[in-house]
Amino acid sequence: MSNESSKKQSSKKALFDPVSFSKDLLAGGVAAAVSKTAVAPIERVKLLLQVQASSKQISPEARYKGMLDCLVRIPREQGFLSYWRGNLANVIRYFPTQALNFAFKDKYKELFMSGVNKEKQFWRWFLANLASGGAAGATSLCVVYPLDFARTRLGVDIGKGPEQRQFTGLGDCIMKIAKSDGLIGLYQGFGVSVQGIIVYRASYFGAYDTVKGLLPKPKETPFLVSFIIAQIVTTCSGILSYPFDTVRRRMMMQSGESDRQYKGTIDCFLKIYRHEGVPAFFRGAFSNILRGTGGALVLVLYDKIKEFLNIDVGGSSSGD
């Protein structure tokens, strides 16, 4: 009895090891910050294409015709550095988001995967991978949503100078919305975000870990193979969850506005479908696929940084 109780206590300590948890935060956060900065211009193009129909700054005749049109007009109309508008907020938001996703993903995995044999219980093992990814994404979203909201609003602010800008920065955006709409204004679109993030993270983490777990030697997987797997996973996950992302960002655009275009999430889905058609749900999706390269780099860099920090990569990536 004493041996069993000591084993349970030691397993609990291992489950909440602060050193391992901190290393997870560092590895995921650094990888995320680097990749997001690299693809920031594409990120902004994607946001503008998604929400321009709901933006009061962009008149119908001035809307972007597509990704290339947007890429050309941004520096011409707003200046070259505006490609990175909202990037600082994105890095600040993305560091804890991705770090918490990865850190909690491994902790949730230890909870879900306990006693599961990959060889004998493959589908249970696969579902556990999906559940750990979805739970990690939903948990982190609850914490950082106001930063995600502010990043979106800053990224789609198309004014050229301070006098034409809706917000002057991250702090100004949060304060203005909180003052006009209260805390709930910073969580506009939160419900559909949770739905989308669970779909995205479940496939993003679950599929990546599952595919890597099927490889003969997960720890010795070549960089190129890991990158290709990650690229396919991020692309498929992004397309699958993209309509949810479009709706949530349209909902975000309503905070601080007296005249609201949508009554709620369902109304937003219906109005986009009726007035703009199915393609509207996927505006900016190609930009999102290109942006997904950054997400693929995050997954691969995360494993490499964990190796550098002497964290057991096999336990987190293979699902063993």
Curated annotation (Swiss-Prot):
Specifically expressed in undifferentiated embryonic stem cells and germ cells. Expression is down-regulated after embryonic stem cells differentiation. In adults, only expressed in developing gametes in testis. In testis, expressed at higher level in spermatocytes. Expression is probably associated with entry of the male germ cells into meiosis. Expressed at very low level in Sertoli cells. Disruption phenotype: Male mice display a significant reduction in testicular size and are sterile, due to impaired spermatogenesis. Males show increased levels of apoptosis within the spermatocyte layer of the seminiferous epithelium, accompanied by the absence of spermatids and spermatozoa within the seminiferous epithelium and lumen respectively. Early meiotic arrest: an accumulation of leptotene spermatocytes, a decrease in pachytene spermatocytes and an absence of diplotene spermatocytes are observed in spermatocytes. GO terms for biological process: cell differentiation; male meiosis I; mitochondrial ADP transmembrane transport; mitochondrial ATP transmembrane transport; regulation of mitochondrial membrane permeability; spermatogenesis. Coiled coil: none annotated. The chain crosses the membrane at residues 21-50, 88-112, 123-143, 192-212, 224-244, 285-302. InterPro entries: ADT_euk_type, Mit_carrier, Mitochondrial_sb/sol_carrier, Mt_carrier_dom_sf. It is found in: Mitochondrion inner membrane; Membrane; Cell projection, Cilium, Flagellum membrane. Keywords: Antiport, Cell membrane, Cell projection, Cilium, Differentiation, Flagellum, Membrane, Mitochondrion, Mitochondrion inner membrane, Repeat, Spermatogenesis, Transmembrane, Transmembrane helix, Transport. The keyword Mitochondrion applies. Gene3D superfamilies: Mitochondrial carrier domain (1.50.40.10). Residues 248-253 are annotated as: Important for transport activity. Residues 1-20, 113-122, 213-223, 303-320 are mitochondrial intermembrane. Residues 51-87, 144-191, 245-284 are mitochondrial matrix. ADP binds at R93, K105, R248. It catalyses: ADP(in) + ATP(out) = ADP(out) + ATP(in); dATP(out) + ADP(in) = dATP(in) + ADP(out); dADP(in) + ADP(out) = dADP(out) + ADP(in); H(+)(in) = H(+)(out). GO terms for cellular component: mitochondrial inner membrane; mitochondrial permeability transition pore complex; mitochondrion; motile cilium; plasma membrane. Induction: Expression is repressed by E2F6. It is a multi-pass membrane protein. Solcar repeats lie at residues 19-111, 124-214, 221-308. It comes from the Eukaryota. Belongs to the mitochondrial carrier (TC 2.A.29) family. Monomer. ADP:ATP antiporter that mediates import of ADP into the mitochondrial matrix for ATP synthesis, and export of ATP out to fuel the cell. Cycles between the cytoplasmic-open state (c-state) and the matrix-open state (m-state): operates by the alternating access mechanism with a single substrate-binding site intermittently exposed to either the cytosolic (c-state) or matrix (m-state) side of the inner mitochondrial membrane. Specifically required during spermatogenesis, probably to mediate ADP:ATP exchange in spermatocytes. This is ADP/ATP translocase 4. It comes from Mus musculus (Mouse).
